[in-house]
Amino acid sequence: MYVVYAIRLDDYVGRSLSPSQALLKVGVSVHDVWYRLDANERFEGKNSYRALFKKIEVLGQKKFDTKDQAEAYEKMVLAGLGKKDLSIAETVKGVTELRVETPGRLETLQALGLLEG
């Protein structure tokens, strides 16, 4: 099983920027988003999401049977969110596209079925 997830990253403590708004990260993982966050922390250490952001909130995740299905859905979601807004100085595996959270982007996640609640 694969999932496409959306997480909110807030209170960045890295070295390249001080965003006043939360950031959105959309990605693909095996199992679930928690597996991805745990693996990221285990392998990335000081450059993990949990080390670089004080607040991490799972906004939603959607299950797929195959990696191809998940990647196609992720591509559609990323296109719907528009171009990435920024990059951080630290190299974090899997973090190539961050976007500033906006009401419009949250509406897009909701419309595409990726925002829980």
Where are these regions (language model features)?
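Non-catalytic accessory segments flanking enzymatic or RNA/DNA-binding domains
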Residues: M1-G117
